[in-house]
Amino acid sequence: HGWGYDMNVACSSATFGIQTGVDAIRNGSARRVLMVNPEICSAHLAWEDRDCHFIFGDVSTAVILERGEDATSDNQWEVLGTRLQTRFSNNIRNNFGFLNRADPSGVGSRDKLFRQEGRKVFKEVCPMVAEQITGHLGDLSVPVEDVRRLWLHQANLNM
């Protein structure tokens, strides 16, 4: 028995899926969650615009989340806390992606494809992420020096 839904927000979809899985375990609706995150972005990318395609593509990630007392793997990570944030920006837009592009009136129209001002997005996101991480660590009473690994983004090797 289980449930699933589609959440296509590219670089954040895995983190939102993990948050949902953690919440399901914490509230007792699940003991174990397999979070599979297929990202199919290539069909709505503007391949002639490097800012819009260089970090995106088709990929899938998966993670098993479970209660600590049920975990048996030698490779375990404890979720100490979760915190998500979204912020609207006109510097990155999907314009309904696949749905909008299927309308015959929009075939070949640039505004029907994903678009981003990559450098502007980078300048918006970096300070927001730094504040998010340091604030969350502070709320968890975890010194920055004690952090050995962060999973921030499933982008390509160029990032």
Predicted segments with their positions:
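Acidic, glycine-rich active-site loops and adjacent beta-strand->loop/helix elements
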Residues: 9-14, 37-43, 83-87
